[in-house]
From Swiss-Prot:
The keyword Nucleus applies. Its EC number is 2.4.2.28. It catalyses: S-methyl-5'-thioadenosine + phosphate = 5-(methylsulfanyl)-alpha-D-ribose 1-phosphate + adenine. InterPro entries: MTAP, Nucleoside_phosphorylase_d, Nucleoside_phosphorylase_sf, Purine_phosphorylase-2_CS. Catalyzes the reversible phosphorylation of S-methyl-5'-thioadenosine (MTA) to adenine and 5-methylthioribose-1-phosphate. Involved in the breakdown of MTA, a major by-product of polyamine biosynthesis. Responsible for the first step in the methionine salvage pathway after MTA has been generated from S-adenosylmethionine. Has broad substrate specificity with 6-aminopurine nucleosides as preferred substrates. The keyword Ribosomal protein does not apply. The record marks S197, V252 as: Important for substrate specificity. The gene is MEU1. This is S-methyl-5'-thioadenosine phosphorylase. GO terms for molecular function: S-methyl-5-thioadenosine phosphorylase activity. Homotrimer.
Length: 321
C-alpha cells in the first residue's frame, strides 16, 4: 500500500551509496511507505550481523539538502508480520548510515473515547504485552548488558515532535494528542499480534490507563536505546480496538480505510517536522545525549565475553568494548 508520493523510486534510478552521515531516520508503518517534500537520492542495501533490514534504506533530501533515511517496517510489500519484523537489523542499519534520531510512524487502536479514529498521538510511555518471542536486545548470552528504559521515548525529541506536529492539524477536524494537552502520560500498549485484542483484553488495557495499542513499539524502542539513538513514535489511530460495547470489534477493512485517510495527515506532520528536526540535529539539542551511554552498560567480565557477540556489537558501537 503506497499512499504517500515521491519517496521510493526504483533501485535502478538511485545511487547505491551515500557519502554523508544521515542523522534523521523515519520508520514507516502500514500505509506510510512514501513521503512527500523529499527528493530520493540513494537506495542502500545494508547487511548487518542480524540480517537484512525490512527494506533497503532510502535516502531522500529536503530542498536544503538535509538527508533523511526511510525504512519500511513491514517491508515494501507489507509481507512481514509484527512478530517477524527484523527490528535488530532495522535499527542497526539506520545506525550504520549515521542516524541519531528516529521518528517512527505506526497505526494504532484507540483505548480512549477522546482519541478518535484518524487522530494522532505522541505517546510517552509503553506497556509491553509482547510474548518474548521477538529478539529485544543486541546483547546475548555471553555478553550481557543492561539499558535504562524508564523513559522509553526520548524526552527532548518527544517534546519537539509534539510541539511542531501540532501545526499539521491547525485546519483539520482531527487532533493530535500530546502529554502537554492531556496533562498526563499517554501510554502505548504493545501487543504481540497479528490478531487484534479480545474485548476483555481491550477493557483490561483501558483499566491500566492505556491510551492506544499497537504491535510495533517493542522491541523497536528498546533497540534504539541500546543503539544510542533518540526515538519517538507517532501513532495514527485507525479504530477503537475492541473495548466499545456498542460497536463491532475492529475489522481489517475498517483499519485499511482509516490508514488511507491518515496518510494525508502523516504527510503534513512530516513536512512540519523536517525543518525543526534539521535544526535540532545540527545544534545537537537532540540525538546526542545518549552518546557513550552504552560503554558502561556491560556486566560480563572481559575475559568471559563471547567473541561472536562482541564482534556483532562492534558493528553497532565500534571500539566500545
Amino acid at each position: 500500500m503506497a499512499f504517500l508520493p515521491n519517496l521510493v523510486a526504483t533501485p535502478m534510478s538511485l545511487a547505491s551509496s551515500y557519502s554523508k552521515p544521515v542523522t534523521l531516520g523515519i520508520i514507516g508503518g502500514t500505509g506510510l511507505y512514501k513521503l512527500g517534500a523529499l527528493t530520493p537520492v540513494a537506495q542502500i542495501d545494508i547487511d548487518t550481523p542480524w540480517g537484512k533490514p525490512s527494506s533497503p534504506i532510502t535516502i531522500s533530501e529536503t530542498k536544503s539538502g538535509f538527508p533523511v533515511a526511510f525504512l519500511a517496517r513491514h517491508g515494501v510489500n507489507h509481507d512481514l508480520t509484527p512478530t517477524d519484523v527484523p527490528s535488530r537489523a532495522n535499527i542497526a542499519a539506520l545506525k550504520k548510515v549515521g542516524v541519531k534520531a528516529i521518528v517512527a510512524f505506526s497505526a494504532v487502536g484507540s483505548l480512549q473515547e477522546e482519541i478518535a479514529p484518524r487522530d494522532f498521538v505522541v505517546p510517552t510511555q509503553i506497556i509491553d504485552r509482547t510474548k518474548g518471542i521477538r529478539p529485544s536486545s543486541f546483547f546475548e548470552k555471553g555478553f550481557v548488558g543492561h539499558v535504562g528504559f524508564g523513559e522509553p521515548f526520548d524526552v527532548a525529541l518527544g517534546k519537539l515532535v509534539a510541539e511542531h506536529a501540532d501545526k499539521a492539524f491547525d485546519n483539520s477536524k482531527y487532533k493530535i494528542h500530546t502529554k502537554a494537552k492531556a496533562g498526563k502520560d499517554l501510554t502505548l500498549v504493545c501487543m504481540e499480534g497479528p490478531a487484534f485484542s479480545t474485548r476483555a483484553e481491550s477493557q483490561l488495557y483501558r483499566s491500566w490507563n492505556g491510551a492506544v495499542i499497537n504491535m510495533s513499539a517493542i522491541p523497536e524502542s528498546k533497540l534504539a536505546k541500546e543503539a544510542e539513538i533518540a526515538y519517538q513514535m507517532i501513532c495514527m489511530s485507525t479504530d477503537y480496538d475492541a473495548w466499545k460495547e456498542d460497536e463491532e470489534p475492529v475489522t481489517v477493512e475498517q483499519v485499511v480505510s482509516n490508514l488511507t485517510a491518515n496518510a494525508e495527515s502523516a504527510t503534513g506532520v512530516v513536512e512540519a517536522l523536517l525543518e525543526p528536526l534539521e535544526k535540532a540535529l545540527a545544534d545537537k539539542s537532540i540525538g546526542y545525549d545518549l552518546d557513550g551511554s552504552m560503554k558502561f552498560a556491560v556486566s560480563t567480565a572481559p575475559a568471559a565475553r563471547d567473541a561472536t557477540v562482541a564482534k556483532n556489537l562492534d558493528f553497532l558501537h565500534p571500539g566500545y568494548w
